[in-house]
Amino acid sequence: MRRLSSVALALLLVAPASAEAASQRLLVNGDSLAVGTKRYIPRELEDWRIRQSTAVSRHAYQGADVMRSYGASLPRVIHVSLGTNDDPNQVAGFRAAVDEVMEVAGEERCVVWANIVRPPVAGKSYAGYNRALARESLERDNLRIVNWARMVRRHPEWLSDDGVHVSAEGYRARAKAVARRVRRCGS
């Protein structure tokens, strides 16, 4: 009888951890950079259930619709990798896309968004997009930024000739940084 009580107690102590692990769900919503990290994110978040909706050339304005398509099953944590394919002259449009993503997420979900690295388009840099993300994150407790721009500045050897995509080492590092932020959601 004493042994049975010990087993029952052990099961009770383990049950909450299992329930917590099952509730750790992530949606990756992104462009070609998310395609690049697709194989590495699950390695960094082995105890998470991960869904990935990635498409080369996906735009920021498409992000909210991707999230809406999940309906009530939208995970509590969402990683967004969008903005790289958008016109840097349209900061207001990007800001509107960020607002729409955050509106769909609601206040109960955590959004982890990687800021943007790419060469200027028509002489305009993406600094305005990164400032918009930084400002939004100051106003919203549930928006966390992965400072991809800083990471790439520290490791320019990761960049490919197009100045956007990176080596396998760069994608692994990006996945690790995303995973660190994802794990902090809820804390």
Locate predicted features.
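Bacterial N-terminal signal peptides
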Residues: 6-16
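A short helix->loop->beta-strand "cap" motif at the edges of active sites that frequently abuts
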Residues: 106-110
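Positively charged n-region of N-terminal signal peptides that target proteins for export
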Residues: 1-4
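Conserved SGNH/GDSL esterase-like catalytic core that processes O-acyl groups on lipids
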Residues: 22-100, 119-128
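Conserved beta-strand termini and adjacent loop/short-helix elements that scaffold enzyme active sites
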Residues: 53-55, 114, 146-151
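Catalytic His-Asp segment of secreted/periplasmic serine-dependent ester chemistry enzymes
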Residues: 119-187
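Sec/Tat signal peptide C-region and signal peptidase I cleavage site
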Residues: 17-21
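Hydrophobic/aromatic beta-strand patches that form the interior of the parallel beta-sheet core
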Residues: 27-29, 112, 144-146
